[in-house]
């Protein structure tokens, strides 16, 4: 591709040769190849402008940077007010194709489930569908583990091109606040957007909850075209402010939930791992058995159904597909059962609202004790630690506080902050031992929640990521229990 083909994206001057061949895009100077455009992005810890000369030395044909941040480095410097936005558009231009119908969902909790459920609804209707998010990429013939909720623009558009080339026509993706704030989705052509809820999260990145909300609202304010559907869960404290944003942006507002008018929850009856749910849509009543536990999963399922319906799937097909949903990996996932029937769930809950939701979800079908094993991540919002401790104290009968990716922090200090709110908890720093202890104490009727990691397969300690899986540790503990 020639540099001139980016002329409507990049402010090219007469001194910059439009015939220059562009082989790729990079924002990390260490990954620059000859012929790449290098985007000097300002990060929280480093400024890409400081690495412009290194990028040029590695073969970059031009540097895109904020005005006045890069001097003479031997190759043309193209100044742009928002290099992140330009990178997203350039990535879309370079890779071109994407699945014809793309939807994105934002919110504090539930994004992974909604993206997965939307894909499953489309699949049930016979469509070639994919989902992209925290747990990775799932598509026909493809199931890859991932670590970023929203990939960087270059990786994202390369992936979208691969999916489109493979025949995928429909794709759902998570839109994290980081991803939205950092313009990673700015080149994606979206047909609809969804919102689940808003709670405390990423306070190490966002200065206030309001800033956090506004970052998420870029999905509705900026990325969706006017008239596009905005499917919003209506029963969250932040639903109304989100609805106002969607309306002000000229979007088609579709609300779901008990207060929802597009898909309305009329009745929910809990039956252990499933829920009989009555839903109203445009005067029609649908009675379905949702094979998932927890009120929050009903809301997630309806956001997914709303996204599928609003992008062209008949309502009866979308709602019928809800009876066949499978939970996303590590989302209230039944991982094991003891010989006397006590159940063990692994869940990704690593923030206050999510922990509260999952503990409330299992209470209706727990005849014995609710036991929870959890910790809080290091180098992340420290304010949530006592909040999560209080939630565990209030909603669980037995609490075991352990480590969960302490990173560069002293693990005992993280646990101490949690224990201030739940002093009666048992403290076991070794996560493997904490899970083993919890499984060993289970009696008939008990439910154990191992919270925090979900699908993750590592434990980050002092700069090293060690292999660790809550699923594997639960299974190992069950074997030891019956040995």
UniProtKB/Swiss-Prot annotation:
It catalyses: UDP-N-acetyl-alpha-D-muramoyl-L-alanyl-D-glutamate + meso-2,6-diaminopimelate + ATP = UDP-N-acetyl-alpha-D-muramoyl-L-alanyl-gamma-D-glutamyl-meso-2,6-diaminopimelate + ADP + phosphate + H(+). Pathway: Cell wall biogenesis; peptidoglycan biosynthesis. ATP binds at residues 107-113. The gene is murE. Its cofactor is Mg(2+). The keyword Cell division applies. InterPro entries: Mur-like_cat_sf, Mur_ligase_C, Mur_ligase_C_dom_sf, Mur_ligase_cen, Mur_ligase_N, MurE/MurF_N, UDP-N-AcMur-Glu-dNH2Pim_ligase. It comes from the Bacteria. This is UDP-N-acetylmuramoyl-L-alanyl-D-glutamate--2,6-diaminopimelate ligase. Its main location: cytoplasm. GO terms for biological process: cell division; cell wall organization; peptidoglycan biosynthetic process; regulation of cell shape. Belongs to the MurCDEF family. MurE subfamily. NCBIfam families: murE, PRK00139.1-2, PRK00139.1-4.
